[in-house]
Amino acid sequence: MKADNILQTIGNTPHVRINRLFGDQHHVWIKSERSNPGGSIKDRIALAMIEAAEQSGALKPGSTIIEPTSGNTGVGLAMVAAVKGYKLILVM
């Protein structure tokens, strides 16, 4: 996969078949969200939150985002904000 920026890789995570756990009678697949660039499914929500705010007009170029977080959502927001040029303040 080639991407123009890291945000294009969010959500393009592999599907992996679980072969031995359930035998041949069931076909179980998992989506490996840890393969997102920030290492978490929270990359998806961070991108969705920022893009929704942009589309609604609530977030404009040069804006500062302030978000309470103590985990992976903050990592995702930091990555998306950096690529899109927003300042980000994370608080607990």
Name the predicted role of every residue range.
Residues 1-92:
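PLP-dependent amino-acid enzyme catalytic core
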